[in-house]
């Protein structure tokens, strides 16, 4: 057995590089973060062959003095902190002083830099484990340029594990998207094999930032995102949250703490819990930025700084949850029609009773026409059109931003309606006609008392296979069929939970890698797990799923069950939350509108009214009066 000895610096740096330099994207991350710490307002990234051949980062930051260039390539050398107290309040990206030394130990690295008070630039070169640094004069403006050539040239085993050039560049591009969202003030460019792939111009106002959000997250997310602005004591949460009505499935899940992108189960749980009673989204998208006193968060808990530890984690969780719930509740108060097929009510006009789209004719369920559906109004139709970016349009309670999206913010106007002046108009009805039109609604085809929807009546007409068209004495509204299906299924499951669900054995048990503390979770919540009809065991670090309730049998159990176990770490869910969780996963396929209406009819009156309150109001009278007065 060999005796204990101190490792030589070259070997120590290569071992450290195993944690710091995982792939080319890791190099880009460390070097760009150094540029941001240096106060750069522009960062240009040049990549060749996915980063295996060349990674070049150029910035206009403060630069590095000549006498510190060689020191910058030494291990544990940093300008970010000097005392133990500094480590307790870190605001910079870097602080360990490992990146440049680790990168230079597995590549050929050249660092060229100039400060504002120097008349000339200087260049330092280091190659592999040799650790010898050569410094020579060079030509360069104020700022720094770092070239990393032949990454892993001296560690062939590491080089063999690199993926294709396209895959490695995709990782670089994805990381740049993340940093571009939190540092909107920085101009980023990304070039691959001589071709400019990304050009994120500085975002100096909200409209420009929304343009960047569109570039990174896509127009569908940006158009319907809810803006978040919330502050309490030393906590401030800002950013954008996916609209609960958005049908878009997005991979935008970015959370930042003091400008640093992190992954945190606490945050994911808060977001899912906020959406739990608001939408059927499996993974709602978000770009959230939390500013917190640096003394209240420890960023030195992960080798790649991907995780942090909050000193008051429960307080932070509840703060985020409450802020998101407030935003969702306020958005719900806006009478907004959020749908891929009903984003914009383009025109309201008098049409013939045989109109194929609208209120004038009976609606269809699938291919079958509902013979029993009575016309609500004999001569009116609503034409529906998807909202397009950069196009003038009408919207309920939305605020059109500078780049043509329809992001709903917390200070959006409520219940307002605006129409494009450039739209072609048909002849509008007179005020007398409007009054007559209102009188028709005063005597609907079936009686409605106290604005309550009577389930004993025939099923209402269906619009776009998604909504029931509901009428009261003087109102028209759209009731989402999927929301009713979810609510009725919740009621059914919650009633059965009192006596316990009967689990169904799986033909082939599902096995998932188990976290270290899952056994403790299973032991603590054994009664609850049995009540749900679940049979879960852990053997050889594997979670084995043997029985599940019928409501989630068709779900992706390898994903659904682990996520639920993670949530149990934070709290024991109430029966209503359990019912919602099961119901959400049971409605992934086709649902029958008549069956849903029949189930809705069996609910107690107060339950029916709560569901009916989810209907989206169509303020047709105010709009018609507004048009007639012009």
Curated annotation (Swiss-Prot):
Residues 398-408 have a biased composition (Polar residues). Residues 398-425 are annotated as: Disordered. CDD domains: HATPase_MutL-MLH-PMS-like, MutL_Trans_MutL. Signal peptide: none annotated. GO terms for biological process: mismatch repair. PROSITE patterns: DNA_MISMATCH_REPAIR_1. One of its GO terms (cellular component) is mismatch repair complex. This protein is involved in the repair of mismatches in DNA. It is required for dam-dependent methyl-directed DNA mismatch repair. May act as a 'molecular matchmaker', a protein that promotes the formation of a stable complex between two or more DNA-binding proteins in an ATP-dependent manner without itself being part of a final effector complex. NCBIfam families: mutl, PRK00095.1-1. HAMAP family: DNA_mis_repair. Belongs to the DNA mismatch repair MutL/HexB family. PANTHER family: DNA MISMATCH REPAIR PROTEIN MLH, PMS, MUTL, DNA MISMATCH REPAIR PROTEIN MLH1. This is DNA mismatch repair protein MutL.
């Amino acid at each position: 057995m060999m005796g204990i000895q101190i490792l030589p610096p070259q070997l120590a740096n290569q071992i450290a590089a195993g944690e710091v330099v995982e792939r080319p994207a890791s190099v880009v991350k460390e070097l760009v973060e150094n540029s941001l710490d240096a106060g750069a307002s522009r960062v240009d990234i040049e990549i060749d062959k996915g980063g295996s051949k060349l990674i070049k980062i150029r910035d206009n930051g403060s630069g590095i003095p000549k006498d510190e260039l060689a020191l910058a390539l030494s291990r544990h050398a940093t300008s970010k902190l000097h005392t133990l107290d500094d480590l307790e309040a870190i605001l910079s990206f870097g602080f360990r002083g490992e990146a440049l030394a680790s990168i230079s130990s597995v590549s050929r690295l050249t660092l060229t830099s100039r400060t504002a008070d120097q008349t000339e630039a200087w260049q330092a070169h280091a190659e592999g484990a040799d650790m010898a640094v050569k410094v020579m004069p060079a030509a360069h403006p104020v700022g720094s340029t770092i070239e990393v050539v032949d990454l892993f040239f001296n560690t062939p085993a590491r080089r063999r594990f690199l993926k294709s050039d396209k895959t490695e560049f995709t990782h670089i591009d994805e990381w740049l998207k993340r940093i571009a969202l939190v540092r909107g003030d920085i101009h980023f460019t990304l070039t691959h094999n001589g071709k400019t792939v990304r050009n994120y111009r500085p975002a100096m106002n909200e409209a420009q930032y929304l343009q960047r959000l569109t570039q990174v997250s896509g127009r569908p997310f940006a158009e319907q995102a809810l803006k978040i602005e919330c502050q309490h004591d030393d906590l401030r949460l800002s950013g954008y949250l996916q609209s609960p009505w958005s049908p878009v499935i997005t991979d935008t899940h970015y959370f930042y703490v003091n400008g640093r992108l992190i992954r945190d189960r606490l945050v994911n749980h808060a977001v899912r819990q906020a959406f739990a009673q608001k939408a059927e989204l499996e993974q709602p998208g978000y770009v959230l930025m939390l500013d917190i006193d640096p003394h209240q968060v420890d960023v030195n808990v992960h080798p790649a700084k991907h995780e942090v530890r909050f000193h008051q984690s429960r307080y932070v969780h509840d703060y985020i949850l409450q802020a998101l719930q407030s935003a969702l509740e306020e958005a719900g108060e806006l009478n907004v029609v959020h749908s891929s097929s009903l984003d914009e009510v383009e025109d309201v006009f008098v049409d013939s009773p045989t109109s194929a789209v609208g209120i004038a004719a009976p609606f269809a369920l699938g291919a079958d026409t509902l013979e029993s559906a009575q016309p609500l109004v004999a001569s009116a139709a609503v034409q529906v059109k998807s909202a397009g970016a950069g196009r003038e349009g009408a919207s309920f309670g939305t605020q059109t931003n500078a780049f043509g999206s329809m992001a709903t913010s917390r200070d959006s106007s409520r219940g307002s309606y605006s129409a494009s002046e450039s739209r072609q108009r048909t002849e509008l009805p007179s005020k007398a006609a409007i009054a007559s039109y209102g009188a028709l609604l005063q005597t609907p085809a079936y009686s409605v008392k106290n604005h309550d929807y009577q389930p004993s009546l025939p099923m209402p007409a269906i619009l776009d296979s998604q909504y029931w068209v509901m009428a009261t004495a003087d109102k028209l509204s759209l009731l989402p069929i999927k929301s009713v299906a979810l609510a009725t299924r919740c009621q059914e499951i919650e009633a059965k939970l009192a006596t316990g669900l009967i689990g169904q054995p799986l033909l082939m048990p599902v096995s998932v890698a188990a976290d270290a503390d899952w056994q403790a979770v299973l032991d603590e919540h054994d009664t609850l797990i049995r009540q749900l009809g679940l049979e879960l065991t852990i053997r050889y670090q594997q979670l084995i799923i043997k029985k599940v309730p019928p409501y989630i049998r068709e779900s992706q159990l390898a994903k659904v069950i682990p996520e639920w176990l993670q949530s149990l770490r934070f709290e024991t869910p109430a029966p209503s939350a359990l019912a919602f969780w099961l119901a959400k996963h049971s409605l992934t396929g086709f649902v029958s509108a008549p069956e849903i209406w029949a189930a809705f009819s069996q609910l107690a009156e107060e339950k029916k009214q709560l569901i009916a309150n989810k209907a989206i109001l169509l303020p047709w009278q105010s709009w018609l009066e507004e048009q007639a007065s012009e």
